[in-house]
Regions:
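Acidic/His- and Gly-rich active-site-bordering loop/insert found
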Residues: 1-89, 111, 169
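Predominant activation on well-ordered alpha-helical scaffold segments within soluble catalytic domains
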Residues: 13, 33, 97-104, 133-136, ...
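Buried hydrophobic positions in well-ordered alpha/beta secondary-structure cores of metabolic enzymes
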Residues: 19, 36, 53, 64-67, ...
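Short beta-strand/turn micro-motifs at beta-sheet edges
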Residues: 74-75, 153-157, 219-225
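Short, conserved micro-motifs enriched in small and acidic residues
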Residues: 85-97, 181-184
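Acidic/histidine-rich catalytic neighborhood of metal-dependent amide-processing enzymes
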Residues: 97-164
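Hydrophobic/proline-rich hinge and linker segments of small-molecule sensing/allosteric domains
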Residues: 162-175
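Acidic-enriched catalytic cores of C-N bond-cleaving enzymes acting on peptides and small amides
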Residues: 176-232
């Protein structure tokens, strides 16, 4: 079926209207796979709930990789002033839908030279990276293009790595009037030290080369015999 069988904006709008937080991508994967089939691609959902597509039969293997999960929280889907708003419009259902239509528009000559694999990966926004880990040993492309928001006016050649840290401090419980710092205070001091280290490393560095830190969660569990404090941060 020709590329005109689906309207790109309406197709993306439909994908945005299907909630797909990490771990719950099956419905949107099925929607995207069905759309790929309508566009004449081989569309399917794999064992990791990735939305998959394939076109061409050439020797040069190309992977167009995006992700279809989102962070939690809904943004009302709306088309306003020529812009489409919704959770995942930019990160990253929008880029993946653009890749789908690009693949569907390949010429017959290109299809003879290339085999293009589309992967709308699951759990990219989660530490598990389930979808990418599933396809990594199964696809060996000559070229890979990643669909992530990075500005439309250029091509991003690399991304920084990310370290997720869960820190936990546990110690014997004592009265609040005691002079010794409690578990929560010690954990706060630890994060303050991390900040100081990062800021010292960042002096004179361009943004890409800086160590960026974010405190994502901090919890103090009710004290009984032991004090327990936990925090999650990333670098």
């Amino acid at each position: 079926m020709s590329k005109s069988a689906l309207d790109p904006v309406e197709f993306l709008k439909g994908a945005l209207e299907i909630p797909s937080p990490s771990g719950k991508e099956r419905l949107v994967a099925e929607y995207l796979a069905e759309g790929m089939q309508k566009l004449g691609l081989k569309g399917f959902v794999d064992e990791a709930d990735n939305a998959r597509g394939q076109v061409g039969e050439g020797p040069v293997q190309v992977v167009l990789l995006g992700h279809i999960d989102t962070v939690p929280g809904q943004i009302p889907v709306r088309l306003e002033g020529g812009r489409l708003f919704g959770r995942g419009a930019v990160d990253a259902k929008g880029p993946f839908v653009a890749m789908i239509f690009a693949a569907a528009g390949l010429s017959e000559e290109a299809r003879k030279r290339l085999t293009v694999h589309l992967v709308g990966a699951t759990e990219e926004e989660a530490p598990s990276s389930k979808g990418a880990r599933f396809v990594a040993p199964r696809l060996k492309p000559h070229y890979a293009v990643i669909g992530e928001p990075s500005g439309w006016e250029g091509i991003t050649l690399g991304y920084k790595g990310r370290l997720l840290v869960k820190a936990r401090r546990e110690k014997d419980h004592f009265h609040s009037a005691h002079h010794e710092p409690n578990a929560a205070e010690e954990l706060i001091s630890y994060f303050v030290a991390i900040k100081a280290w990062a800021e010292a490393m960042n002096v004179g560095q361009r943004p890409f080369d800086q160590v960026q830190y974010t405190l994502r969660d901090f919890r103090v569990h009710p004290a009984q015999l032991r004090q327990v404090a936990e925090m999650f941060f990333d670098l």
